[in-house]
């Protein structure tokens, strides 16, 4: 009488979709209002002048201009600003 035990379950076999994080527009490049500059988890970069922050910490331009990255403050925070041309 042939018999076969039931196959066990596995805890693997899943993967999440890529989130496409990172800097989208680099320093010196021009932007128009609404363009996404950085997609990030948390505040790796902070919003400076003419830059807004979405609820998922995405930084976007609020005015037309040129992107500038700078390190400021006692804690070495990295800020993204948009300078009007």
Curated annotation (Swiss-Prot):
A single Gene Ontology CC term: cytosolic large ribosomal subunit
Region of interest called Disordered, as start-end residue ranges on this chain: 1-20
Keywords, ordered alphabetically: Ribonucleoprotein, Ribosomal protein
InterPro entries in alphabetical order: Ribosomal_bL27 (IPR001684), Ribosomal_bL27_CS (IPR018261)
Gene Ontology biological-process annotations: translation
Keyword Ribonucleoprotein part of the UniProt annotation: yes
Record-linked PROSITE patterns: RIBOSOMAL_L27 (PS00831)
Pfam short name (any one): Ribosomal_L27
Superkingdom field: Bacteria
Any one Gene Ontology molecular-function term assigned to this protein's record: structural constituent of ribosome
Family membership noted in the UniProt record: Belongs to the bacterial ribosomal protein bL27 family.
NCBIfam families (UniProt xref): L27 (TIGR00062)
Designated name of the protein: Large ribosomal subunit protein bL27
Native source species: Acinetobacter baylyi (strain ATCC 33305 / BD413 / ADP1)
Gene label: rpmA
């Amino acid at each position: 009488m042939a018999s076969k035990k039931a196959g066990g379950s596995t805890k693997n076999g899943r993967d999440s979709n890529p989130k496409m994080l990172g800097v989208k527009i680099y320093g010196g490049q021009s932007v128009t209002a609404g363009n996404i500059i950085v997609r990030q988890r948390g505040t790796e970069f902070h919003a400076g002048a003419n830059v807004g922050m979405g609820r998922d910490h995405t930084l976007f331009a609020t005015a037309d201009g040129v992107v500038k990255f700078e390190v400021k403050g006692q804690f070495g925070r990295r800020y993204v600003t948009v300078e009007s041309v």
